Amino acid sequence: MEQPINVLNDFHPLNEAGKILIKHPSLAERKDEDGIHWIKSQWDGKWYPEKFSDYLRLHKIVKIPNNSDKPELFQTYKDKNNKRSRYMGLPNLKRANIKTQWTREMVEEWKKCRDDIVYFAETYCAITHIDYGVIKVQLRDYQRDMLKIMSSKRMTVCNLSRQLGKTTVVAIFLAHFVCFNKDKAVGILAHKGSMSAEVLDRTKQAIELLPDFLQPGIVEWNKGSIELDNGSSIGAYASSPDAVRGNSFAMIYIDECAFIPNFHDSWLAIQPVISSGRRSKIIITTTPNGLNHFYDIWTAAVEGKSGFEPYTAIWNSVKERLYNDEDIFDDGWQWSIQTINGSSLAQFRQEHTAAFEGTSGTLISGMKLAVMDFIEVTPDDHGFHQFKKPEPDRKYIATLDCSEGRGQDYHALHIIDVTDDVWEQVGVLHSNTISHLILPDIVMRYLVEYNECPVYIELNSTGVSVAKSLYMDLEYEGVICDSYTDLGMKQTKRTKAVGCSTLKDLIEKDKLIIHHRATIQEFRTFSEKGVSWAAEEGYHDDLVMSLVIFGWLSTQSKFIDYADKDDMRLASEVFSKELQDMSDDYAPVIFVDSVHSAEYVPVSHGMSMV
């Protein structure tokens, strides 16, 4: 009999704001069949035994026999006793150019494995178990789906939660690819060389445990690379652009893509390698890591814009997690609660539900970053993106952060429309190729175009000369000065802290609308660093810092003059709703003065300030 839900004891942290993301196990459908009590999972609609012991009995481990003396049983035969046929004396590895006495059954089985990767995996792929020795791989449902997609599609991107066993399924696919294809080079890329080497080790194990009739001969069997006698090879590399340049790969596998720094540079090197062949493959797998480059790759794949086939799997794909500590099926209720309590809800969503949360400590909240949309426009020859053309009756303010090193950091100029209550980014100059000698002339061109708008310049090493040239040489009177000697603003800890805090409020409260794609991308990797804010390793923050200058300026009294406002208090503009709520909560006390005495009449929920 089903038990009623106790709202005090049966709360789950995933169920927030009235949304039921996980049902209590007492609400699941049940049935009795074949002497087993079955419970229907809410995740895949399949029936599972109530007891974990029954689940293990139905999915029992299958050991692979050690067959080295019965070649007629070719499905498991390895000629281990013949050292002349072994590579470097290793019993599980066949030496190159060893002749195989093929039978019709062997040929048919070989073709079946070539054409059906799932059959190949479930029939011949094995792992070494710490207790049972060599056992057959038991594929999970998601692993079967992944194998089918990777095999049939040219470009695949997989958004997966942690600890699903993705390395195992990728290793099986790589082993299948090099065993059944001639002259194919495979490159494994990861954040670190040790991570790509781990994937290669798992692939080597999959090849090593194949029976002799499926295993190609070994030419090289090194720590960082292998080569087979069919001409195929696999190499493990760190994800630097130099790793793939000069090589021609038939397939590239990128592991933990979301955690690779400077991925843009690596991606520019990878694309020509893949595009060199019409059938070249690329496979990307990762757990999300905030809203960085992988978020863009995944979004483009889901929207069908990039040619990548998207696939995702989350924590409930591991069926052992659907049983509690008492080995009773609860559909993952206890496991998910314990995991969340051991970390945080946001971390659980990112690492176990493959959700794109903001990178830990980003200036702008992850929820806001996820809904920020950009407008795609083609920049002009100088790198200026125009989102809205200038209008004569509107008021604009510009901020400029000059690059300190040509070819490295970027010049970043933002032009903001401050006419209405909601401010809007209407133009962006973003370039790291413009010389600071000619930058004042280029900047002035756009400032004049936007109604000769005022500009606030950060006085860094090159900003001083740019501001001086703009104000004195070009006689542009719209340069906003902090003093008689400072033709702009000098960035300090205080100005940066106030500017960052103000910018966060402006964007999260929809006071400032951003249209520039690169600006939004920089926000995704602009996070807390000690007691300040900065771009994460391998990323830029020039566009964000130019907006931080605008955030600081908007808090200054002179902003009213440049924005052509009669009177403005930024807190009233940004937090109007919060201030109104405070006003309602703390209504004033009303004093009534009569002829004989004075008395007060408190308004309900009022508060006396006396």
UniProtKB/Swiss-Prot annotation:
EC numbers: 3.6.4.-, 3.1.21.-
Swiss-Prot/TrEMBL GO biological process terms: chromosome organization; viral DNA genome packaging; viral genome packaging; viral procapsid maturation
Keyword hit for DNA damage: no
Motif (Walker A motif): 161-167
UniProt keyword terms in alphabetical order: ATP-binding, Endonuclease, Hydrolase, Magnesium, Metal-binding, Nuclease, Nucleotide-binding, Viral genome packaging, Viral release from host cell
Motif (ATPase coupling): 285-287
Motif Walker B motif: positions: 251-256
Species of the source: Enterobacteria phage T4 (Bacteriophage T4)
Family indicated by similarity: Belongs to the Tequatrovirus large terminase family.
Protein name in the entry: Terminase, large subunit
Keyword Nucleotide-binding: yes
Region named Binding to the portal protein: 328-352
Effect of substituting E256V: Complete loss of terminase small subunit-stimulated ATPase activity and in vitro DNA packaging activity. No effect on ATP binding and endonuclease functions
